[in-house]
């Protein structure tokens, strides 16, 4: 899963990568950290992204550098990605914005840099297989603006696309907020445009500079591509909210016209800024508590109380869970309201009017199978008017949660939360109303914020996490001989 990375332009020497194991603790305290292996590189600064492939290799994208390591963080290969020259010959550092894999042809995809373009790279030697001498603008070229991208199917076209969400930018003509990019063929990284429509969603020209959208995370689920976003509550508002937006992977015409949005709420309205997200199928106990459908997954999101203009997170955080079946119903309601609404005032509420070409026809019969994915001419860009409230299970009064990853251990659902002070919180998600934070792990050699990318190894016995200049692999064993420590199973929500 991809996410928002607000990177710094400050250059600091050396990236340190460390393999660590961490002993089980019985309470929230400093961890006993055992260093197993280290990797250092003096040619780089400021890490941006990490991803693991199906074979266990780990890829790390830093400023002007890209690495491939094995599962033990042993160095395998690296390549230089920057700096890049502008038209005047001035050099600009290359900050990576997107790092993802197209498994159909075993290619690593990287995006970023001064031109905001993408490269298709060999998974093994990291060399660019396909690039362009005339860059295709895909993502923002500003280090402080967000971009999220991931590879997911497009069933009508018959091959995957690179789904991208990026903050409004000035580098290049008309970069769409949300787009589906070709990753095969002659028009690589171009938007799909043909007689049926296009795979792009643009903000209305009137709001290009006044309606910024921050992209936090993205994922694929049940033939839709989703993005977690932060945006203004209304076009003329100074208040910000978090929204989930999606496009359909099945549309056979008018491709992305079925783009729609739903507002996310957690705890109360003050927790308005989504910081990180993770989608997974929880373990048995939590699945039963949530009454999940077969194979249904849950979206975990970390929120922060924010201050506005610009939207800035504070150290008050909350974790909310969303059943994907409820999310899907909320999007269905948005489309249905857009199609069958009665009267101009209702029609206006269901229209995502900040998007170029948005319209709700109204007064038409709604058929989910026909309209939810294929907009045809009945609507373009629906806005849900009913907020989607999550299960509020944990909160922190003095901790900014910056990243989240969730896994299952036996019948338990366990989360790992990165913080703004460089620690990791271990959380037991017990049921639909509560969770227990039962351990705090100190991130060795750094108090810098944990960045969003947290991934598990192939066996899910370790997880990888990093700050902007330290990369580590943790063992997350919290039990002894298959049994949880007493504090883990005895603590109860009160």
What are these regions (language model features)?
Residues 2-5, 13-40:
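N-terminal signal peptide
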Residues 217-219, 318, 405-407:
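Residues within well-ordered beta-strands of beta-sheet-rich folds
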Residues 47-52, 59, 98-101, 217-218, ...:
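Short, exposed beta-strand/loop patches in secreted or surface proteins that constitute
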Residues 28-37, 42-75:
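N-terminal-proximal low-complexity accessory segments that begin disordered
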Residues 45-49, 401-404, 448-455:
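Canonical WD40 repeat/beta-propeller blade segments in eukaryotic WD-repeat proteins
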Residues 75-107, 112-210, 230-398, 410-494:
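Beta-propeller fold recognition
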Residues 209-214, 218-220, 226-227:
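Surface-exposed extracellular loop regions of Gram-negative outer-membrane beta-barrel proteins
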């Amino acid at each position: 899963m991809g996410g928002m990375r607000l990177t710094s332009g400050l250059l600091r020497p050396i990236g340190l990568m460390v393999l660590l194991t961490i002993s089980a603790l019985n309470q929230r305290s400093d961890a006993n950290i055992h260093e197993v292996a280290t990797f250092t590189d003096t040619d780089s600064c400021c890490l941006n992204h990490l991803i693991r492939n199906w074979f266990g290799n780990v890829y790390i994208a830093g400023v002007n550098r890209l690495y491939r390591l094995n599962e033990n963080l042993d160095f395998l290969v690296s390549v230089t990605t920057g700096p890049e020259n502008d038209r005047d010959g001035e050099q600009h550092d290359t900050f990576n914005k997107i790092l993802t894999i197209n498994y159909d042809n075993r290619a690593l995809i990287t995006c970023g840099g001064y031109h905001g373009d993408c490269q298709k790279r060999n998974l093994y030697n990291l060399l660019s297989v396909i690039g362009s001498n005339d860059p295709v603008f895909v993502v923002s070229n500003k280090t402080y603006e967000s971009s999220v991208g991931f590879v997911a199917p497009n069933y009508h076209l018959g091959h995957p696309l690179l789904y991208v969400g990026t903050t409004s930018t000035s580098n290049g003509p008309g970069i769409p907020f949300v787009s589906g990019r070709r990753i095969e063929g002659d028009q690589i990284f171009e938007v799909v445009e043909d007689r049926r429509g296009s795979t792009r969603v643009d903000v209305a020209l009137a709001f290009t500079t006044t309606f910024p959208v921050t992209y936090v995370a993205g994922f694929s689920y049940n033939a839709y591509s989703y993005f977690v976003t932060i945006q203004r509550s209304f076009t003329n508002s100074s208040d910000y909210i978090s929204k989930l937006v999606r496009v359909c992977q099945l549309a056979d015409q008018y491709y992305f016209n079925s783009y729609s949005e739903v507002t996310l709420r957690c705890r109360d309205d003050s927790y308005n800024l989504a910081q990180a997200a993770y989608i997974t199928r929880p373990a048995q106990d939590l699945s039963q508590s949530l009454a999940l459908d077969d194979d249904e997954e849950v979206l975990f999101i970390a929120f922060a109380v924010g201050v506005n203009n610009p939207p800035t997170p504070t150290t008050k955080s909350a974790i909310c869970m969303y059943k994907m079946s409820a999310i899907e119903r909320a999007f269905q309601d948005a489309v249905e309201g857009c199609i069958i609404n009665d009267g101009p005032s209702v029609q206006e509420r269901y229209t995502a009017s900040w998007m170029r070409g948005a319209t709700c026809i109204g007064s038409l019969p709604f058929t989910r199978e026909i309209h939810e994915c294929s907009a045809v001419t009945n609507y373009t860009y629906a806005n849900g008017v009913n907020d989607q409230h999550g299960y509020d299970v944990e909160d922190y009064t003095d901790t900014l949660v910056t990243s989240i990853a969730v896994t299952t251990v036996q019948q338990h659902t366990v989360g790992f939360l990165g913080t703004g002070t460089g620690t990791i919180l271990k959380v037991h998600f017990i049921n639909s109303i509560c969770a227990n934070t039962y351990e705090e792990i100190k991130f060795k050699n750094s108090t810098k914020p944990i960045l969003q990318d947290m991934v598990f190894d192939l066996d899910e016995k370790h997880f990888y996490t990093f700050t902007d200049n330290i990369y580590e692999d943790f063992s997350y064993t919290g039990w002894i001989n298959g049994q949880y420590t007493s504090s883990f199973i005895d603590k109860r929500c009160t």
